[in-house]
């Protein structure tokens, strides 16, 4: 049996874990504080939250960790749950997506750990401790497009899988019912209730069809695949899941990186722009700029195959199984 720790922020970690777990040839138990129900997991253990204290103290343990608030009851219960899982279930390995503290805690209990890396600036001590402790590192992007300096020390145990999309293997579904000139997809990892400039874009471009999907528009759908395949242009942030899904659909994309810890999305945006896979902009385009984007969208054929989404989840699963079988 393999454990799979899934971070609760947003939906990207859950989608990635679900995609990978579906290719693992043994029971996989999810450990998470997120709302996660997926048949690929033999069990989901709900972990206590460790971020409910409005005034957490000494959260980084003097710079050694990222999140270990002093005397936090939620953290204490959470770690006790993980310890009980290891003691009673004896996992062959645990995947951590993502947490420095969980990685180190599990390794201290003698459990082989596979860590999912994220883009950005990860040269700080906590990240490097986790990467050194890991038995393997999964980098869910193409090796030829992004190899940050902070990862070079760990390359011998790093598997670059390509972008992991929940839609890998699905046939394109293009239909007028789902068509839009501009499809704006927002994730669940940002600021809840924050206004989105796309809400007025339809009024500014009455000659075009603008569709918004996500919490910012109150129009979340579980399966945006037909929308992604049918759009002339898709607008996304630079989260790993969003980029992988856009790559799987193969449509032209406008990528607007959002502010995230460790400059995660900025790094991905820079990679996409340098590789000419998407139009990357740091701010919301003007109305005239949108018209220009749409005028050129028809002749745009991004080489999304370079993001290597085909088979990425399966490659991650094989790397996980290799550690579990040692």
Annotate each language-model stretch with its function.
Residues 21, 166-233:
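Donor-nucleotide binding loops and adjacent catalytic segments primarily
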Residues 62-93, 98-103:
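Conserved nucleotide-sugar donor-binding subdomain of glycosyltransferases
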Residues 93-98, 224-267:
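A donor-sugar binding/catalytic signature common to diverse glycosyltransferases
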Residues 13-24, 36:
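Short amphipathic alpha-helix
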Residues 7-8, 26-75:
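Conserved nucleotide-sugar phosphate-binding/catalytic loop shared by glycosyltransferases and other
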Residues 291-326:
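C-terminal amphipathic helix plus adjacent low-complexity
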Residues 5-18, 124, 192:
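A short, glycine/small-residue-rich beta-strand->loop->alpha-helix junction that serves as a flexible
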Residues 133-192:
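A nucleotide-sugar donor-handling region in carbohydrate enzymes
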């Amino acid at each position: 049996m393999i454990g799979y720790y899934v971070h609760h922020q947003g939906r990207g970690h859950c989608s990635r874990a679900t995609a990978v777990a579906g290719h693992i040839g043994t029971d996989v138990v999810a450990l998470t504080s997120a709302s996660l129900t997926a048949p690929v997991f033999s069990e989901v253990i709900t972990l206590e939250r460790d971020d409910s204290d409005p005034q957490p103290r000494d959260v980084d343990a003097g710079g050694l960790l990222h999140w270990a608030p002093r005397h936090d009851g939620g953290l204490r219960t959470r770690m006790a749950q993980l310890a009980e899982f290891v003691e009673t279930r004896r996992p062959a390995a645990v995947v951590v997506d993502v947490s420095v503290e969980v990685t180190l805690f599990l390794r201290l209990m003698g459990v082989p750990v596979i860590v999912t890396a994220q883009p950005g600036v990860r040269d700080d001590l906590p990240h490097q401790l986790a990467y050194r402790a890991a038995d393997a590192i999964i980098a869910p992007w193409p090796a030829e497009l992004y190899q940050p300096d902070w990862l070079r020390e760990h390359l011998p145990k790093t598997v670059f899988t390509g972008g992991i999309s929940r839609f890998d293997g699905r046939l394109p579904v293009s239909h007028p019912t789902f068509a839009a000139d501009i499809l704006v997809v927002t994730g669940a990892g940002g600021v809840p209730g924050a206004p989105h400039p796309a809400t007025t874009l339809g009024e500014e471009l009455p000659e075009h069809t603008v569709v918004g999907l996500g919490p910012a528009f109150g129009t979340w759908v579980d399966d945006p695949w037909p929308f992604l395949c049918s759009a002339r242009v898709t607008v996304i942030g630079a989260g790993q899941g969003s980029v992988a899904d856009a790559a799987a659909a193969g449509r032209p994309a406008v990528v607007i990186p959002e502010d995230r810890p460790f400059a995660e999305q900025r790094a991905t945006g820079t990679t996409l722009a340098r590789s000419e896979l998407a139009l990357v902009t740091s701010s919301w385009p003007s109305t005239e700029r949108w018209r220009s984007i749409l005028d050129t969208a028809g002749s745009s054929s991004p080489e999304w195959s370079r993001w290597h989404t085909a088979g990425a989840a399966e490659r991650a699963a094989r790397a996980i199984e290799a550690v579990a079988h040692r």
